[in-house]
């Protein structure tokens, strides 16, 4: 049988827990008036009135009004004081609030059939307003998911912030001293105006002369900008006094990158807008950087930690390095140097090492240092890195009295004894983590410390112990031996006939289960899903092949209108996954020569090791061009005649190359292939080094770094030479098409760096 071969918790959550009293919903007003008494349940007539208003205007985007939890106020509404709400509200008239407005639901809209008037407005909810917005202060609108905000009239305010990156915010016009839109990434002029007008404590950025000027204004992941706006709105301190001419001048200098004017000065005299911007600018001195990172402003410190050179960061004391704003800034560095991570990993317990543990793709040495720390919070964050840990550390985690630590252990590369110990754990979370890990390791061929037979034994034990726990067995499913997979499929079929439809069919490995699913889902959608399954037997593939062909013949329009479930796509999937026999490839060849089979043709020509009998068929009645030539040159089973013709097609406009081929024409095969392999012409060499007809000694003699992996991937490369090279440099195995699995497993388990281990794990998945 042949297989196709182709060449070819939130990151800063603990910091917020320790510092920012930010809630999941933005509550931006103090002493809010209870507005419940103003509203009642919306009737069908109320909703119809809204729909009529929407339909009469091309500027308004409709909201779904079918939900029963809409509340309505009929007529104009005037409220004395601040208001806030997270409900679906309709006002059938003008809304006048003698104070501030805060809406804090990302999905529950406000519909106002009239004007909205207030002091300041912070809206997280989608808005639909048939009139205008009038605010004496700030209007801050976030738009999320698929819910845009539309204002038929204008937005009039002193300042406007609009986050319209995810969904649009539409108004007929705006009138303000500044308006910053998140989608307008290079509007530094309005940013400068905002810096001069807004109280510095109400924003979180320093963006003068920043190429991606608006990137951090609307950081929803930590809601600092909106959170700071809310805090200052509660204090009624959103705007600063009129800025001095000196501040205007200094901001202009920063915008132009003129930093010399700020050197040698006491930074305590700097306006916060200036101080927070300086760390981002190139050309400031080491002395100024030192002052900034030792300032009293946390935003400035964080920004400086992000941009300070590595050597200056490493000069900081442990106390400075573990200070929360410094940690925040460091974790925003890309890349974060190993030297800085090493210092952070050895700091006393605190936000430094804890948040370092949250970072993705930590170097191996850093993972090992953190894993040995006696602080449960750090260990819990290493779950994503547990597969890198040695057996001894996993042992320690499994013996812990804390189930959350045992759960981390369950995510590691386990031995049989460790897995059986976890299988008897008293915590359901631990057992579920074990089941998930077993399924993951088996499905991807990444069992490093136990054999497939041992994995099956653990999975069988879990199945027997938790047989009636459908949720757990569902997690364990891919780790189950074939007979138990079949049993579970039959059992779930009785409970839910469609339980294993669709994508599940693509990963089942039990042949009996697959046969049963083919009977149950005997239609193009079922065939399409099964065709993607790498475990499908050739006999099942032949059944699906014939059924897809028959469906195309008998239902040509339905098949033509389909995409994923068309016969063309189904057949292409069948020859792209798992085992394929010669006859199936020959059938594919015949089809693509007789009709329109674009996907099937693409799948077939992606092979690099097609049998000679298939290549012979493909050679006939096929247009000769560069694509045709390169296809035959990369095939390991191309004949001399096919390679010669391919080279003549590719080099048709190169008389010297053609002359060389003419001279070689009289030479015996050994010399012909050897000469091509030693040629300086790229595709002469390519065609020979890929081909199994090239003498093994010639392949072994190839030492050009650009070509020797090509030679070593040739199936006729001398085995003894390959073993000797792999002994000297085991990493070569990761570049081979079919390396020894044990060698790749050793690299995945004991590779010197994380990158090596990750590459080896990807290789195991690819090979499996």
Swiss-Prot record:
Pfam family, one: DUF2773
GO terms for biological process, alphabetical: response to methylglyoxal
Recorded superkingdom: Bacteria
InterPro entries xrefs: DUF2773
Family: To E.coli YkiA.
Protein's recorded name: Uncharacterized protein YdbD
Species this chain originates from: Escherichia coli (strain K12)
Lineage: Bacteria, Pseudomonadati, Pseudomonadota, Gammaproteobacteria, Enterobacterales
């Amino acid at each position: 049988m042949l297989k196709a071969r182709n060449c070819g918790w939130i990151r800063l959550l603990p910091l917020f827990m320790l510092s920012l009293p930010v809630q999941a919903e933005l509550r931006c007003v103090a002493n809010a008036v209870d507005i419940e008494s103003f509203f009642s349940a919306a009737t069908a007539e109320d909703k119809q009135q809204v729909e009529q208003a929407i339909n009469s205007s091309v500027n308004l985007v409709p909201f779904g009004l079918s939900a029963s939890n809409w509340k309505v106020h009929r007529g104009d509404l005037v409220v004395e004081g601040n208001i806030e709400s997270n409900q679906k509200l309709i006002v059938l008239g003008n809304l006048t609030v003698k104070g501030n407005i805060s809406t804090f639901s990302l999905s529950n809209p406000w519909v106002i059939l009239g004007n909205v008037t207030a002091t300041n407005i912070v809206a997280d909810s989608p808005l639909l307003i048939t009139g205008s917005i009038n605010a004496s202060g700030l209007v801050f609108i976030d738009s999320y998911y698929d819910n845009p905000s539309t204002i038929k009239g204008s937005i009039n305010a002193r300042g406007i912030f609009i986050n319209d990156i995810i969904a649009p915010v539409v108004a007929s016009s705006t009138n303000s001293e500044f308006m910053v839109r998140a989608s307008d990434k290079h509007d530094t002029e309005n940013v400068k105006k905002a810096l001069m007008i807004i109280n510095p404590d109400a924003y979180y950025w320093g963006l003068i002369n920043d190429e991606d000027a608006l990137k951090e204004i609307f950081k929803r992941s930590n809601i600092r900008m909106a959170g700071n706006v809310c805090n200052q709105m509660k204090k009624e301190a959103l705007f600063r006094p009129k800025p001095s001419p000196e501040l205007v001048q200094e901001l202009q200098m920063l915008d132009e990158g003129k930093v010399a004017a700020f050197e040698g000065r006491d930074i305590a005299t700097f306006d916060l807008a200036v101080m927070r911007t300086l760390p981002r600018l190139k050309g400031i001195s080491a002395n100024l950087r030192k002052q900034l990172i030792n300032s009293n402003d946390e935003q400035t410190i964080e920004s400086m930690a992000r941009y300070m050179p590595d050597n200056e960061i490493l000069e900081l004391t442990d106390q400075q390095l573990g200070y929360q704003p410094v940690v925040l800034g460091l974790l925003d560095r890309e890349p974060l140097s190993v030297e800085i991570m090493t210092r952070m990993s050895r700091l006393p317990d605190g936000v430094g090492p804890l948040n370092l543990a949250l970072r993705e793709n930590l170097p191996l040495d850093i993972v090992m240092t953190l894993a040995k720390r006696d602080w449960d919070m750090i260990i819990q964050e290493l779950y994503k890195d547990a597969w890198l840990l040695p057996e001894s550390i996993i042992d320690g985690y499994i013996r812990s009295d804390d189930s959350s630590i045992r759960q981390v252990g369950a995510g590691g590369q386990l031995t049989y004894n460790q897995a059986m110990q976890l299988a008897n754990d008293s915590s359901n979370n631990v057992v579920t983590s074990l089941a998930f890990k077993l399924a993951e390791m088996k499905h991807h061929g990444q069992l490093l410390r136990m054999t497939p037979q041992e994995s099956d034994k653990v999975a069988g034990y879990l199945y027997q112990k938790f047989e009636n726990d459908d949720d757990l067995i569902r997690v364990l499913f891919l780790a189950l031996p074939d007979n138990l997979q079949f049993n579970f499929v039959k059992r779930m079929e009785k409970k839910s006939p469609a339980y294993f439809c669709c994508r599940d069919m693509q990963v089942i490995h039990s042949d009996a289960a697959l046969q049963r699913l083919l009977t149950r889902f005997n239609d193009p959608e079922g065939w399409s899903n099964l065709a993607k399954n790498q475990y499908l037997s050739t006999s099942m593939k032949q059944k699906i092949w014939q059924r897809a062909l028959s469906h195309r013949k008998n239902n040509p329009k339905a098949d033509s209108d389909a995409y994923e479930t068309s016969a063309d796509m189904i057949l292409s999937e069948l020859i792209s996954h798992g085992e394929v026999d010669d006859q199936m490839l020959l059938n594919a060849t015949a089809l693509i020569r007789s009709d329109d089979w674009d996907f099937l043709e693409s799948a077939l020509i992606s092979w690099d090791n097609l049998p000679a009998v298939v290549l012979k068929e493909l050679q006939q009645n096929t247009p000769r061009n560069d694509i045709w030539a390169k296809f035959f040159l990369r095939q390991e089973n191309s004949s001399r005649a096919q390679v010669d013709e391919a080279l003549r097609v590719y080099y048709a406009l190169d008389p010297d190359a053609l002359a060389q081929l003419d001279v070689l024409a009289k030479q015996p095969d050994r010399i012909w292939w050897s000469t091509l392999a030693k040629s300086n012409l790229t595709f002469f060499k390519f065609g020979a080094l890929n081909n199994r007809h090239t003498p093994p000694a010639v392949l072994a003699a190839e030492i050009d770094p650009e070509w020797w992996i090509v030679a070593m991937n040739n199936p006729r490369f001398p085995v003894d030479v390959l073993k000797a090279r792999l002994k000297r440099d085991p990493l070569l195995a990761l570049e081979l098409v079919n390396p020894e699995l044990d060698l790749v497993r050793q690299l995945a388990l004991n590779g010197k760096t994380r990158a090596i281990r990750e590459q080896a794990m990807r290789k195991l998945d690819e090979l499996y």
